[in-house]
C-alpha cells in the first residue's frame, strides 16, 4: 500500500492573479481614479505589478501626504469599476473543490482590502471557508498560522515569503507578475503553470508521489 502525505488542515490561496485576473477591473478603477483626481496614472503599467499593497502603487503617482486619502477614494470606487470586470482564472474553482474533496479547508489570504476581496469572491461564486484581507508578504503568516494552513498558493514572490514565514509549503503559480525562475529563486517549493495543475499536484502530494519529472512541476529544496 502506497504511503500517504496527510493533507494540511487548511490550504491558503492568494487572490489577485492567483484565483482572479483582476487586471481589467483594476485598470478600469485606476482610469476612473485618474479622471476623478486629475492626476495621470498609467493604468496599463500599474496592472503589470499587482501584488504589493495599494499604497506601494499609489506612491508612484501621488505625493506621500495624499496616499491615505487617495487610497480611501480608490477603495470606495472599486466595487463600481472592478468587480464585474474581473474573471476567475482557469482552475480557480476546481482548485478550491479539490481541497474540499480531499477533506481540507480553503482560505483566501490577500493584500486586497478585505470587503472588496469578499465582493470578488461572491460575484464569481467562489466560496472559501474564510477570507482574510489587508495582509502582504510576511504579514500573511499570522493568518496562515491562525487557520492552520500547511500550504499557501500564490503568484508573487511576496506570497512565497509569506508561506515560508508561516512554515507552510509554498506552491506558486506563474499567472502573475513573477516568472517561474523568480518564484523558484524566492524559495517556492513547487511551481505550477496555473491552477489547472493544482488538483493533480494535490493528489500526488497527498499520496506521497514525486512530481519532479511531471511537466509543470518544479519542486525546490527548502532551505
Predicted regions and their residues:
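Substrate-recognition element of Asp-dependent hydrolases with the DxDx(T/V) motif
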Residues: 30, 92-121, 134
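Non-catalytic pre-domain segments flanking phosphatase-related domains
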Residues: 1-13, 200-223
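Acidic, Mg2+-coordinating phosphoryl-transfer loop and its flanking beta/alpha structural elements
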Residues: 110, 153-196
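Short active-site oxyanion
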Residues: 103-107, 128-130, 148-150, 168-170, ...
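Short loop-to-alpha-helix "cap/lid" segments that border enzyme active sites
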Residues: 135-147, 157, 161
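N-terminal helical cap/lid subdomain that shapes the substrate entry/recognition surface
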Residues: 4-93, 102
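A short, structured active-site edge motif that brings together acidic residues
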Residues: 45-47, 126-140
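Surface-exposed amphipathic alpha-helices with a cationic face
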Residues: 93-101, 145, 160-167
Amino acid at each position: 500500500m502506497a504511503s500517504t502525505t496527510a493533507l494540511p488542515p487548511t490550504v491558503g490561496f492568494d487572490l489577485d492573479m492567483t484565483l482572479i485576473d483582476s487586471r481589467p477591473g483594476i485598470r478600469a478603477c485606476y482610469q476612473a481614479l485618474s479622471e476623478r483626481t486629475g492626476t495621470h496614472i498609467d493604468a496599463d503599467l500599474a496592472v503589470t505589478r499587482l501584488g504589493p499593497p495599494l499604497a506601494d502603487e499609489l506612491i508612484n503617482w501621488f505625493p506621500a501626504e495624499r496616499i491615505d486619502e487617495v487610497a480611501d477614494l480608490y477603495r470606495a470606487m472599486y466595487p463600481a469599476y472592478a468587480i464585474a470586470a474581473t474573471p476567475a482564472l482557469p482552475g480557480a474553482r476546481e482548485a478550491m473543490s479539490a481541497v474540499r474533496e480531499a477533506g481540507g479547508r480553503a482560505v483566501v489570504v490577500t493584500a486586497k482590502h478585505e470587503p472588496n476581496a469578499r465582493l470578488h469572491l461572491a460575484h464569481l461564486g467562489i466560496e472559501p471557508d474564510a477570507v482574510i484581507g489587508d495582509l502582504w508578504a510576511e504579514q500573511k503568516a499570522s493568518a496562515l498560522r491562525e487557520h492552520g494552513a500547511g500550504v499557501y498558493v500564490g503568484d508573487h514572490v511576496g506570497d512565497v515569503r509569506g508561506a515560508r514565514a508561516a512554515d507552510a509549503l509554498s506552491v506558486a503559480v506563474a499567472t502573475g507578475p513573477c516568472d517561474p525562475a523568480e518564484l523558484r529563486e524566492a524559495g517556492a517549493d513547487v511551481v505550477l503553470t496555473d491552477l489547472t495543475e493544482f488538483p493533480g499536484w494535490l493528489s500526488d502530494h497527498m499520496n506521497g508521489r514525486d512530481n519532479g519529472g511531471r511537466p509543470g512541476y518544479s519542486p525546490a529544496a527548502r532551505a
